[in-house]
């Protein structure tokens, strides 16, 4: 799917794609007449996710949507409802749920390998110095929280194995009001969990961060650094064992292979659209906490956790 003829010609040759399977945005809805296409993967600027997920579902296709699911909780609900109405599977592009290091963090945390997780910390960000759609709120819906911070949200939840009950947050001072006139330059937040555990997180468009995820309990800790990239992931534990000495893989290939298997074998995806809705609820709560300076309850957030790795 592209409006750029040069790209269409390149991909046609590179991947041996038949002409009938090449579309542009004007012909998108004609997908309904093409049984050769089973899945649509929506990888557009955030504000366009809702429209194209709904249209893909209406065309009778299963859908994967990149993160964040949408730019509002209302749109996220609409997307989930559209896929349910169409009877099609709906998944979020949460590739790290299929990545060995992060899967092991899920297992260690949820199985309480170091006792109940009492504290988590996570950071993720990069230095953005030139204008792009990422700092245009009309397209992005927000700044680094929507882009890089969502990995911290995800990591803390799937490692702790719980959805937080409240959040506090604050925006960092804006170092470049011209560049960051529409979105935050950075934000810090803390999740509070029902058992007293906390998760301290940071995300930035002003700093190349290490992309770290750490979880500690009374008997030790586990850490990934880097935790969220497409390769080079590495981890360690307080016991200096080899539990996080794991291979790096093609994460998105694993993610897409799993979704194909879900469709072929009629089983649910471990990262359903509802998980993206959950995360939009949390992102909105973080923004509300930062804007008001008040602790915001998240007790009404969808209670959904990926327990696949911990169950193995």
Labelled PLM ranges:
Residues 96-180, 293:
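Predominantly a Rossmann-like dinucleotide-binding segment in NAD(P)-dependent oxidoreductases
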Residues 39, 244, 261-312:
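C-terminal helix-rich "cap/oligomerization" subdomain common to oxidoreductases
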Residues 76-95, 115-122:
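Rossmann-fold dehydrogenase core element
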Residues 3-7, 245-256:
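Active-site loop of classical SDR/Rossmann-like NAD(P)-dependent oxidoreductases
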Residues 1-15:
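NAD(P)-binding Rossmann-fold cofactor-contacting core
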Residues 154-231, 253-267, 284, 301-312:
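Contiguous beta-strand/loop segments that form the cofactor/metal-binding neighborhood of enzyme cores
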Residues 20-82:
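Beta-loop-alpha module in the N-terminal Rossmann-like domain of NAD(P)-dependent dehydrogenases
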Residues 24, 65, 90-92, 201, ...:
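Hydrophobic residues in well-ordered beta-strands that form the structural core
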């Amino acid at each position: 799917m592209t409006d750029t003829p040069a790209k269409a010609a390149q991909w046609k040759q590179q991947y041996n794609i038949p002409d009938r399977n090449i579309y542009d945005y004007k012909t998108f809805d004609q997908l309904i007449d093409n049984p050769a296409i089973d899945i649509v993967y929506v990888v557009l600027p955030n504000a366009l996710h809702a429209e194209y997920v709904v249209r893909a579902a209406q065309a009778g296709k299963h859908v994967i949507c990149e993160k964040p699911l949408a730019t509002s909780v209302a749109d996220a609900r609409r997307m989930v409802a559209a896929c349910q109405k169409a009877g099609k599977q709906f998944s979020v592009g949460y590739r790290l749920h299929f990545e060995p290091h992060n899967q092991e963090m899920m297992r260690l945390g949820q199985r309480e390998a170091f006792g109940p997780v009492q504290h988590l910390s996570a950071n993720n960000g990069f230095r953005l110095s030139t204008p792009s759609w990422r700092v245009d709120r009309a397209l992005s819906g927000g700044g680094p929280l929507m882009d890089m911070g969502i990995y911290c949200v995800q990591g803390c939840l799937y490692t702790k194995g719980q959805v937080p009950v409240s959040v506090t947050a604050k925006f960092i001072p804006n170092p470049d009001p011209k560049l960051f006139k529409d979105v935050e330059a950075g934000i810090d937040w803390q999740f509070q969990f029902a058992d007293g555990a906390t998760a301290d997180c940071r995300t930035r468009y002003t700093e190349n961060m290490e992309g770290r995820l750490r979880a500690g309990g009374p008997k030790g800790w586990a850490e990934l650094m880097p935790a969220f990239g497409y390769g080079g992931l590495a981890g360690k534990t307080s016991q200096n064992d080899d539990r996080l000495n794991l291979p790096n893989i093609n994460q998105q290939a694993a993610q897409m292979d799993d979704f194909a298997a879900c469709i072929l074998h009629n089983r649910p995806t471990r990262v359903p659209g509802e998980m993206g809705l959950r995360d939009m609820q949390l992102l909105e709560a973080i923004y509300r906490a930062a804007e008001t300076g008040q602790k915001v309850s998240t007790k009404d957030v969808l209670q959904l956790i990926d327990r696949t790795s911990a169950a193995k």
